């Protein structure tokens, strides 16, 4: 369906834009969005986006130095006084000491994704709907007419 093609374009362009802004691989951003496809019965496509923060462990980790105050590099990001630790739930995460927190002085290092994802999807979905949808619908209608006339 035409709507599904336009929605897929919106997902791809939004994911690329967010990946550039946050300096995260496009694949990691794109897998956070799903498309509930439009059907003949329900002609509405629905884009579902996980806007939660992205844990840094997903970027791939390199330790620069083995001192207590060493730098941990994840993708293009650098984190001072960070370390890798296995949590009680069995997952590995990058942790960092947080100044000013008395009770739990370490925290999982995350990249905030909510604001860039919301902004990019709002902009791109509206723009692509305005620009691409009429042309796509026209070409789909032409194709259906071509098929119907051939019979």
Where are these regions (language model features)?
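Short, Lys/Arg-rich flexible segments
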Residues: 1-151
């Amino acid at each position: 369906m035409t709507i599904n093609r336009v929605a897929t374009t919106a997902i791809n362009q939004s994911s690329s834009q967010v990946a550039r802004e946050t300096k995260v691989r496009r694949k990691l951003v794109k897998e956070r969005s799903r498309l509930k496809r439009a059907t003949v019965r329900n002609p509405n496509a629905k884009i579902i986006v996980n806007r939660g923060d992205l844990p840094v462990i997903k970027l791939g980790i390199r330790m620069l130095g083995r001192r207590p105050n060493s730098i941990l590099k994840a993708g293009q990001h650098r984190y001072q006084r960070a370390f890798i630790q296995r949590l009680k739930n069995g997952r590995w995460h990058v942790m960092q000491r947080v100044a000013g927190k008395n009770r739990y002085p370490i925290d999982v290092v995350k990249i905030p994704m909510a604001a860039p994802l919301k902004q990019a999807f709002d902009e791109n979905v509206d723009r692509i709907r305005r620009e691409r949808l009429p042309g796509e619908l026209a070409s789909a209608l032409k194709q259906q007419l071509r098929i119907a006339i051939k019979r």
